[in-house]
Regions:
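Non-catalytic interaction/clamp surfaces of large macromolecular machines
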Residues: 2-12
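Terminal amphipathic helices with adjacent charged low-complexity linkers/tails
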Residues: 11-13, 18-19
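Conserved beta-strand edge residues that scaffold enzyme active sites
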Residues: 15, 144-145, 168-169
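Phosphate-handling DNA/RNA-contact segment within nucleic-acid enzymes
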Residues: 22-161, 176
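Phosphate/diphosphate-binding loops
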Residues: 162, 167-190
Length: 190
């Protein structure tokens, strides 16, 4: 974690974790008495056609994804080293709809309200780095899919500006182009 700029108090502040090698979580939860269907429903395990369970997340730094009040509703994991996908989120659930959640909103909403400004980035580590640098009004879209619901949420907390800070790669440029589609008559792009 330290090599990725996530050392010191960061893991504690952001409740970061680690998902070890494959099969360890399923074995641990089974030993604690959890049933296979409970693990699948909780979105921490997947079941193959033969009914064999496997960990949804392994060999990943884990980021709890909270709602606006900070209650954990999902997880995101970034692979350690090489591997695909680089980032993996919990699947959609009755509580978690990726298009309606902004990572770090619980920690950023007060700063958004006091400054009137929201900074929006693509990923977990971007949010954490900005908060550590003093930009506590930053949130992430959990990838590049900015939605109208995200804009509504941001507009509720940040009354003056929404500043997009997407990555400079092709995916980031596409995200910025899509974000411009959501600008309405009450917003002025800068």
């Amino acid at each position: 974690l330290g090599a990725r700029g996530l050392g010191g108090e960061v893991p504690k502040t952001w409740q970061l974790g680690f998902a070890p090698g494959p099969g360890q979580l399923v074995r641990h939860l089974s030993a604690k008495g959890f049933k296979p269907d409970e693990m699948v429903q909780a979105n921490v395990a997947l079941s193959n056609d033969g009914g064999k369970l496997r960990d949804r997340f392994f060999n990943r730094v884990m980021f709890p994804i909270g709602d606006a009040q900070g209650e954990c509703i999902a997880f995101g994991g970034r692979v350690i080293g090489t591997g695909e996908p680089k980032y993996l989120n919990t699947g959609e659930t009755p509580l978690f709809h990726k298009s309606e959640v902004l990572y770090g909103l619980d920690k950023a909403k007060a700063a958004m309200a006091s400054t009137g400004v929201a900074l929006i980035v693509e990923g977990y580590t971007d949010v954490i780095a900005l908060h550590e640098a003093g930009f506590t009004n930053a949130v992430a879209t959990l990838g590049t899919a900015l939605t109208r619901q995200h804009i509504r949420i941001l507009s509720h907390h940040a009354k003056s500006k929404i500043i997009y800070l997407f990555d400079g790669d092709a995916a980031g440029q596409r995200a910025a182009d899509r974000a411009l589609e959501f600008i309405d008559s009450s917003m002025t792009p800068e």
